[in-house]
Structures are given as C-alpha cells and as structure tokens.
Amino acid sequence: MRPTQTMLGGGGGAPIGKHNHYLGGWGNFGGMKQRGIISYGISPNRQNPLAGTAHDAVFNTFRRVSSQFLYWAPSLVAGYYIMNWAIERNHYLNSKAGRAEFAGQEE
C-alpha cells in the first residue's frame, strides 16, 4: 500500500509536487488571509434534524404505495384467490365426501 501525500510529507512539510502555493501544515496555516469566503452556520442546539419526519413519512409512503399499486395489487389478489381455492380443495379432498369420490384412484 502506498503512503498518502500527507504521510510522505510528515504531515507538516510542503506537499510533494506542490511548490507554488502552500498555506502551512496541519493546524499551522500561515499564509495570506483569504477574502470573499462566506460561511454560514447554525448552533447545534438550534437545529431540528427530525422536523416534519413523521408527517413526511406518512404522506410520502402513501404517495409511493399509490403510485405502485397497479404493479403489486393484481398479483396479491390472484395469490389470495388461488390460496383460498387450494385450501377449500384440500378440505374437500380430506373430507368424507372427497375421499369417497376419489377412493378408487389412489396409486
């Protein structure tokens, strides 16, 4: 595994291959003051990362399910009716009437 540029430079020297514009090592930036860079921040105790999560979860879930409804609903209904038919057929074949009807067909 090859060491990174920071490790080759020892973490404090000039990066290898960059001789023109160097601000300094880690924690020791010693260059000209930069201008025109604006950054905005908000205090961590003023943030609300879960704002609207429950509301969005309900309505986003409804939107996504309703848009996919025609893809999964027909197979769900078909599966329900096939299972219902199979259960009823099994009950009939294991009943007294079903055994009497198919008694001579066993192999």
Swiss-Prot record:
It is found in: Mitochondrion inner membrane. Residues 94-107 are mitochondrial intermembrane. The gene is qcr8. It comes from Neurospora crassa (strain ATCC 24698 / 74-OR23-1A / CBS 708.71 / DSM 1257 / FGSC 987). The chain crosses the membrane at residues 63-93. Residues 1-8 form a propeptide. GO terms for biological process: mitochondrial electron transport, ubiquinol to cytochrome c. This is Cytochrome b-c1 complex subunit 8. GO terms for cellular component: mitochondrial inner membrane; respiratory chain complex III. It is a single-pass membrane protein. Component of the ubiquinol-cytochrome c oxidoreductase, a multisubunit transmembrane complex that is part of the mitochondrial electron transport chain which drives oxidative phosphorylation. Component of the ubiquinol-cytochrome c oxidoreductase (cytochrome b-c1 complex, complex III, CIII), a multisubunit enzyme composed of 10 subunits. The complex is composed of 3 respiratory subunits cytochrome b (cob), cytochrome c1 (cyt-1) and Rieske protein (fes-1), 2 core protein subunits pep and ucr-1, and 5 low-molecular weight protein subunits qcr6, qcr7, qcr8, qcr9 and probably NCU16844/qcr10. InterPro entries: Cyt_bc1_su8, Cyt_bc1_su8_sf. SUPFAM superfamilies: Ubiquinone-binding protein QP-C of cytochrome bc1 complex (Ubiquinol-cytochrome c reductase). Keywords: Electron transport, Membrane, Mitochondrion, Mitochondrion inner membrane, Respiratory chain, Transmembrane, Transmembrane helix, Transport. Residues 1-62 are mitochondrial matrix. Pfam families: UcrQ. Belongs to the UQCRQ/QCR8 family.
